[in-house]
Amino acid sequence: MIRCGVFLLMTVDTEKYLDFVAGVTSPASSDFAELLRRFTELEVKSDCDTPHLLTAALGLAAESGEFTEIVKKIILQGKPYTPDNVFHMKRELGDICWYIAQACMALDTTFDEIIEMNVEKLKTRYPGGEFDVHKSENRKVGDL
């Protein structure tokens, strides 16, 4: 560790860290043949709709990042809150909805079921119908 003013800078052996990361990475995450084997296993042994599920997960991450980038620039970097930027955010939300639809197809569900489940979860978490910081941070067992 190196002391720099009020900050402590840690020195890291990046090669050692990369070796560590490689050691704790699943075979399907590090070997193409294992990834194909896992896809095949999911296809044969379960009713997992892997193409839609993967499309949804990757797309939601990407499009949520694009939406977040606009918000970050407006709130933290001085980008103006204009009708054009609101339109851009709405377009990104539309893309997010498209990927939610992909997830619904993968999970054989509907938007309605997902929203109903969310409402029930939040009613259980906040029985009075009002947000509570303590309940949001200290959840009951099984409250995902």
Locate the predicted segments by residue.
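Flexible "arm" and connector segments at domain edges
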Residues: 2-144
